[in-house]
């Protein structure tokens, strides 16, 4: 039995069309009509495939690659072997990503299990819901009353869209997701199992018991956002939870009520953001970062993985540690502690 190919490369691409798409000039003597059948790592790329290289650690792999062509920075271009065409660009990885998007269009967003547009048997769409042309709804999906779904959007199996939810055009809503109390922009990707719009965790604490605070806000997800599998985004308590345009959120992230995330932020898996915190544009949170509530993380700041942020972060900062602080301070503290521990160990041995 042969191994299945889950995502096949698009046919009809040539070296010339690929170079043009990547904005890279072909070197003299290269044949632009040569077919390109795929992309692969340096070690496994064959004579009709492309690879990329932008890290000195892979110098040996570059020297022995059999790839038809390799996207490289000017620094590594002289090391491309004679049998491989050097496609020189300042940002090989970004160019490679653009190439992959052309070769593997199916991998760019989750698709329908059923190729035809329309409502599949076994799906349940309320008569008061409104679907634009070209919407695809897989079996088991539920669309509530008053919901509106834009053209080209796909709902995976068992996805649940609550009453009055708005979903824009060309979105992909993965299998088993729930979307309630939410307004979703265009070209948004939500991976399987995500939960968006459920109650925020709000209680008035007291000795006589904890009184639930009604959560009456919404979730606003702007255009071109991607949300990973099993991520949870709570709706606002009295104002909206917002995820800004172009932000990318990994799997297993928790975003609490009233959080506002700016444009083009990157949030890696395992992050927890407590209520009413604001991330300005282009913030990056590494894996397993914890952010306490009611803070502001300034534009362009980067927080190292496994850090705990318990105070405001100025714009353009690089912080890490628990509690988080500027990375230079954090590194100095870690170095000092290591030296103290080493010295203490020597003293004990001598004693």
From Swiss-Prot:
NCBIfam families in the cross-refs: lipid_A_lpxD, PRK00892.1
Keyword tRNA processing: no
Family: Belongs to the transferase hexapeptide repeat family. LpxD subfamily.
Gene3D superfamilies: Hexapeptide repeat proteins, MurE/MurF, N-terminal domain
Domain of life the protein comes from: Bacteria
A family per Pfam: LpxD
InterPro entries documented for this protein: Hexapep, Hexapep_transf_CS, LpxD, Trimer_LpxA-like_sf, UDP_GlcNAc_AcTrfase_non-rep
Descriptive protein name: UDP-3-O-acylglucosamine N-acyltransferase
Record-listed E.C. numbers: 2.3.1.191
Listed PANTHER family: UDP-3-O-ACYLGLUCOSAMINE N-ACYLTRANSFERASE, UDP-3-O-ACYLGLUCOSAMINE N-ACYLTRANSFERASE 1, MITOCHONDRIAL-RELATED
Organism whose genome encodes this protein: Methylorubrum extorquens (strain CM4 / NCIMB 13688)
Active site (UniProt): 257 (proton acceptor)
A GO term for molecular function: N-acyltransferase activity
SUPFAM superfamilies registered for this protein in UniProt: Trimeric LpxA-like enzymes
Keywords linked to the UniProt accession: Acyltransferase, Lipid A biosynthesis, Lipid biosynthesis, Lipid metabolism, Repeat, Transferase
């Amino acid at each position: 039995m042969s191994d299945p190919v889950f995502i096949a490369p698009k046919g009809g691409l040539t070296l010339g069309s690929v170079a043009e798409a990547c904005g890279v000039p072909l070197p003299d003597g290269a044949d632009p009509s040569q077919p390109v059948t795929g992309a692969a790592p340096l070690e496994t790329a064959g004579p009709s495939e492309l690879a990329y290289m932008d890290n000195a650690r892979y110098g040996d792999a570059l020297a022995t690659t059999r790839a038809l062509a390799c996207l490289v920075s000017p620094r590594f271009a002289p090391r491309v072997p004679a049998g491989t065409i050097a496609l020189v660009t300042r940002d090989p990885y970004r160019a490679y990503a653009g190439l992959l998007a052309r070769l593997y269009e199916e991998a760019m967003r989750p698709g329908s299990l059923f190729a035809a547009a329309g409502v599949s048997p076994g799906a349940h769409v309320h008569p008061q819901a409104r679907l634009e042309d070209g919407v695809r709804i897989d079996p088991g999906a539920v669309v509530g009353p008053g919901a509106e779904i834009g053209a080209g959007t796909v709902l995976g199996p068992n996805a649940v869209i609550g009453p009055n939810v708005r979903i824009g055009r060309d979105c992909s809503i993965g299998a088993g997701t729930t979307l309630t109390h939410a307004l979703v922009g265009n070209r948004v990707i939500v991976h399987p199992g995500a939960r968006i719009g459920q109650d925020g965790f709000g209680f008035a604490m007291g000795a006589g018991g904890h009184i639930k605070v009604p959560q009456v806000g919404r979730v606003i997800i702007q255009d071109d956002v991607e949300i990973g599998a099993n991520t949870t985004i709570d709706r606002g308590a009295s104002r909206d939870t917002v995820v800004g345009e172009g932000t990318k959120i990994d799997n297993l992230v928790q975003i609490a009520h009233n959080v506002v995330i700016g444009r083009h932020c990157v949030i890696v898996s395992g992050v927890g953001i407590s209520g009413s915190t604001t991330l300005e544009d282009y913030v990056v949170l590494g894996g397993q970062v914890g952010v306490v509530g009611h803070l502001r993380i300034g534009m362009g700041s980067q927080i190292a993985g496994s850090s705990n942020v318990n105070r405001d972060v100025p714009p353009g900062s690089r912080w890490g540690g628990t509690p988080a602080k500027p990375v230079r301070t954090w590194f100095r503290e870690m170095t000092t502690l290591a030296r103290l521990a080493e010295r203490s160990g020597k003293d004990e041995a001598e004693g």
